[in-house]
Amino acid sequence: MVKVDYRNTKVKKPWGSEYLIYQNDTIAIWLLKIIKGQNTSLHCHPAKKTGLILLTGEASVELGFYETKKLKAPAKVMIRPGLFHSTKALSEDGITVLELETPVDKEDLVRYKDEYGRKEKPYEGKESMVDLKKDDIIFGEPENGRTLEYNFNST
């Protein structure tokens, strides 16, 4: 299977969108925007550890088949490899989430349940990709001894 380059593109999803804001050999960081009342598929990554950082809003995160956590930004949750999970936006304005994945592999995906007809289907391909806009954030590699700062709110 040909690897898709997700840099400088936004992946449109039925629940919102996501795009890659930083990647190196060991980690990929994605920015997710989830619309109110919408949720990601109940899915797992057999070989990948995932961290979710809720930047804005309130969310419900399903962990496995028996646990649900309600989160209010700022909040975080770590998800071990193989644990099925789903994230739902509860806030009127939706939610913004940073998703950290290691190792880097978008094909490491098993969809168990999906409200949008994607059960057992792979990650979206080029047909779902659009160009980033000028106000979309991309994390740069800071120079040694320096930090980079980003504002996720419009104010």
What are these regions (language model features)?
Residues 5-12, 86, 90-142:
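Double-stranded beta-helix
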Residues 38, 47, 67, 83-84, ...:
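A generic "binding-loop/recognition-motif" signal
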Residues 30, 40, 67-69, 77, ...:
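Short beta-strand segments
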Residues 65-85:
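Short acidic-glycine-tyrosine-enriched beta hairpin
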Residues 6-44, 48, 136-155:
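A short glycine-rich, His/Asp/Glu-containing loop-to-beta-strand
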